[in-house]
Regions:
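Non-ligating segments of multi-cofactor redox enzymes
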Residues: 1-85, 89-90, 99, 103-137
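Basic, alpha-helical nucleic-acid-binding regions used in initiation and control of genome expression
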Residues: 94
Length: 137
């Protein structure tokens, strides 16, 4: 009866002096894995506007159908997204939208800290997707 107690005590003492596995999350942060897919963001072109040409491929390839696009043309005849909405509550973060984009406008970010008390902030518009670039160096 005393032998199992001594074995358990020896194991406890052995682990007591080893490096802790736990991190103190809010103060310490683990960098995401190389292939981590967080919330999406848009890249800007040389004019400072979104690179998106509103081709609709991301909307067509999305398995959860969380992307909605309305297109328009500017005075130079270039297409742009008049309305681009990404519903992050429906998104499964598969990365198909990033792969399908022919101009490299949308990217999967590294941001994994995104908590809001209401659902409305999870509807990402063009402006919010351009802003999200700041959270993804």
């Amino acid at each position: 009866m005393i032998l199992p107690i001594l074995k358990g005590l020896a194991l406890t003492l052995n682990r007591f002096f080893s490096k802790p596995i736990t991190i103190q999350y809010p103060e310490e942060k683990v960098p995401p894995a190389k292939r981590w897919r967080g919330i999406q963001y848009f890249e800007k072109d040389e004019r400072g506007k979104t690179k998106c040409v509103a081709c609709g491929l991301c909307m067509a390839v999305c398995p959860s159908q969380c992307i909605y696009i309305e297109t328009a043309e500017d005075e130079e005849g270039r297409r742009y997204p008049l309305t681009y909405e990404l519903d992050a509550t429906r998104c499964i973060f598969c990365g198909f939208c990033e792969e399908a984009c022919p101009v490299g406008a949308i990217f999967m970010g590294k941001n994994y800290e995104w908590v809001e008390p209401e659902r409305k902030p999870y509807i990402m518009t063009t402006e919010k997707l351009l802003e999200e670039k700041k959270n993804n160096p």
